[in-house]
Amino acid sequence: MKFFLLFLVVLPIMGVLGKKNGYAVDSKGKAPECFLSNYCNNECTKVHYADKGYCCLLSCYCFGLNDDKKVLEISGTTKKYCDFTIIN
């Protein structure tokens, strides 16, 4: 019974660790610019190995990036806007 309870506590934490959202950057520190969401989904999933991506404020915003990927530093308001848009 204790093992089962421990499993229920640890499982959600494992899903959260290692994933983040943001503007993934290349080796030069720049996020890809965009006008279409399809381009960003391909860029995020195939180049940066994210779960998905879309165009948010003329740059590719990736959802579900690995923790070791570098992302562009953005304001909290921009991050909330892009996170909210991708969820809805």
Curated annotation (Swiss-Prot):
Chain's role: Excitatory insect toxins induce a spastic paralysis. They bind voltage-independently at site-4 of sodium channels (Nav) and shift the voltage of activation toward more negative potentials thereby affecting sodium channel activation and promoting spontaneous and repetitive firing.
Primary location recorded for the protein, binned into one broad class: secreted
Cysteines joined through disulfide linkages: 34-55, 40-60, 44-62, 56-82
Sequence ranges assigned to domain LCN-type CS-alpha/beta in this UniProt record: 20-83
Family affiliation: Belongs to the long (4 C-C) scorpion toxin superfamily. Sodium channel inhibitor family. Beta subfamily.
PROSITE patterns, per the entry: LCN_CSAB
Top-level taxon in the UniProt lineage: Eukaryota
Protein's cellular compartments: Secreted
Free-text comment about domains: Has the structural arrangement of an alpha-helix connected to antiparallel beta-sheets by disulfide bonds (CS-alpha/beta).
GO terms under cellular component: extracellular region
Listed InterPro entries: LCN-type_CS_alpha_beta_dom (IPR044062), Scorpion_toxin-like (IPR003614), Scorpion_toxin-like_sf (IPR036574), Scorpion_toxinL/defensin (IPR002061)
GO terms assigned for molecular function: sodium channel inhibitor activity; toxin activity
This protein's UniProt keywords: Disulfide bond, Ion channel impairing toxin, Neurotoxin, Secreted, Signal, Toxin, Voltage-gated sodium channel impairing toxin
Tissue: Expressed by the venom gland.
UniProt protein name: Beta-insect excitatory toxin LqhIT1a
GO biological process: defense response
Secretion signal span: 1-18
Pfam annotation, one family: Toxin_3
Organismal lineage: Eukaryota, Metazoa, Ecdysozoa, Arthropoda, Chelicerata
